[in-house]
C-alpha cells in the first residue's frame, strides 16, 4: 500500500533478517539517509540490531571503509589524533562551524540568513558535533553587544554552494542581494558561485601543489601516507589555497602569525614528525619514495570489537545514552521534543508533515505522481569530475541531445517511461509546481 512492495516480500525479508546473524554496514549512508525523515530508518536499524543482540558476534553497525580497517602501528587508533595539532587540525575539522567565530550559520541556511533574518534554529549542523548540540537553540544574528552582525562579505574557497547543496536558486538570489557588498572566490575554474563573485583568485589544481596526505578512505586496506609532489608548475599566476590565504594575511599584517615562518617543506616535515613516521622510514627515504605504508599492528586482533564490552557487561560498559542502555524510546527526544511529529521518541513510519508531503497519498501526487530521488551522480562526486570530457563520453554519464548539449541522465522505471512514451535517449523535463 505504501511502497509498492508486496506484503509477503516484506515479511520474508523480516524473517530472513531475524533468523540470521546480521550486521548492517554503511559507507556514508547514500540516498537512504538523504531525504525527508531519513532519521527514522537510521534509528530503526538500531532497534533491529538491538533485537539481534548488538555487540554480539556478527551483530554490529559499522562503516565499511577506513574506520573498520585493522589498527596500524604508530597511530594508536583508527582515528589520527595528536594533541599538539589539536587546534590546527582536530578542532577545525570536527566543529568548523563554531571553531572560532562568535556567530554561526549552518551552511544549509546561508540563503535564509541573508534573505530572511532573523533566524532561530536547533543545533549548529557541525560535522561530528556532540549529540547534545541538537537540543541547543541558536539565533542569527546575535545581539550587537554579543558580537552579532549581518553578512556583508562572502569568501569561498569551495564555490559550489549552488550545485552541491540545497536551495540553489535561492542561493543565487542571496548572492546577488544588495546587502552583500563583496564576494571573493578562489578556484581553478569559473564554476557556480564564481559567476557571482566580485573577485576571483586563481587557485591551483591538485596537480600543481606540494603537500603531504593520508590515503585511508579510497577503498585500500592499509594506512598510507603520501608525499605529494606537484606534477606541473602552477598555471599562470595561480597559487595553492594555502598561498592565497597567506598572501591575504600578509596584506592584513598577519602573514608571519599565519605561517609561523614555515615553508611548505617545513610544514610537510612537521606533519611527518608529528605522526612519528620516522619510526618507519627516514625523511630522506620518504622524500625519495614519496610514500610509506604503515604496517598493521601485530596485536590488532586483540582490539575491542565494536560494542562487545556492552554486550558482555552492559552495567559496567554503558553506551552514551541517558540510561546507558539501548533505548527503543528516546529519553532525549521525549524530554526536549515530545510532540515532534517528524521525529517522535520511538521511530516509526511518518506519512507526512507540514514540511514534507511527498507520498502517493498526498493531494500533490494527483498532479505529480513520480517521486524524484536525487542520488549522487554515477560518474562523479557531487560536481567534482563533471568537467572531465572522458567521463562525458560514457553513455550513462550524459545524454547528448539534438542541440549538442550534454544533459544530465534521468533514470525512469520502464513502466513509467512506457506510459509516457519516453524512450532511451529522449530529453525530458522534470518539474513540479515549485
Language model features with spans:
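Intrinsically disordered or highly flexible coil/loop and linker segments, enriched in small
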Residues: 5, 19-26, 54-61, 160-163, ...
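A glycine-rich, hydrophobic/aromatic-adjacent loop/helix-cap motif
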Residues: 8, 13, 17-140, 327
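Short, hydrophobic/amphipathic alpha-helical patches that form generic packing surfaces
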Residues: 44-51, 246-251, 375
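Alpha-amylase-like alpha-glycosidases and glucanotransferases acting on alpha-linked glucans and related
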Residues: 229-238, 242-246
